[in-house]
Swiss-Prot record:
Major place of residence: nucleus
Biological process annotations from GO: chromosome segregation; protein maturation
Intracellular or extracellular location(s): Nucleus; Cytoplasm, Cytoskeleton, Spindle
Function: Component of the cytosolic iron-sulfur (Fe/S) protein assembly machinery. Required for the maturation of extramitochondrial Fe/S proteins. May play a role in chromosome segregation through establishment of sister chromatid cohesion.
Organism, scientific name: Dictyostelium discoideum (Social amoeba)
Family: Belongs to the MIP18 family.
Domain of life: Eukaryota
Keyword Nucleus in annotation: yes
UniProt keyword terms in alphabetical order: Chromosome partition, Cytoplasm, Cytoskeleton, Nucleus
Protein name, entry field: Cytosolic iron-sulfur assembly component 2B
GO cellular component: cytosolic [4Fe-4S] assembly targeting complex; nucleus; spindle
Pfam families reported for this sequence: FeS_assembly_P (PF01883)
Length: 163
């Protein structure tokens, strides 16, 4: 049974830019850099990477469910650090870890290795936020979850695949 069988949809498909709409901008010269250049990212670019991730329970994107929002993306380019807050649809969401793993994995696959990425549950939005945050930001736990559990990796891959 779903934790949230009837989630609120904040953005409908017609008003939501798809990844394909943004694909041309990702292939522009702004993103074509030489190996020795530092590529600067902004909050919009990071948001564009995660907005189209689908929810593990519903055929909706994290943007449509208001799980990710551009104002919850924080970047410190000087330290190559990204902090992204996400808000589960209900305080008892059992999919929070999978959503967080999907966000982390999408960013890990998309960003240069120099970036440290922390994905955190928005404070006060989940009943087990400290436990979820601890698991999501422990490299060994994340690696173990993705490397040793083919079912978790399959779900994460399904969530982050481009539609």
């Amino acid at each position: 049974m779903s934790d949230n069988p009837n989630p609120v949809i904040y953005v409908d498909n017609e008003n939501c830019k798809s990844f394909e709409d943004n694909e041309n901008s990702f292939n522009s010269s702004r993103y074509s850099i030489e190996e020795d250049q530092i590529d600067e990212f902004d909050e919009q670019e990071i948001f564009d990477l995660v907005r189209s991730i689908t929810d593990p329970e519903h055929p909706l994107t994290l943007e449509q469910l208001n799980v990710v929002r551009i104002e919850n993306v924080n970047i410190n380019l000087e330290n190559s650090y990204i902090l992204l807050y996400f808000t589960p649809t209900v305080p008892h969401c059992s999919m929070a870890n999978l959503i967080g793993l999907s966000i982390k994995e999408k960013l890990a696959r998309s960003l240069p290795k120099r970036f440290k990425v922390d994905v955190i549950v928005t404070p006060g939005s989940h009943s087990s936020e400290s436990s979820v945050n601890k698991q999501l930001n422990d490299k060994e736990r994340v690696s173990a979850a993705l490397d040793t559990s083919s079912s978790i990796l399959t779900i994460v891959n399904e969530c982050i695949k481009q539609n």
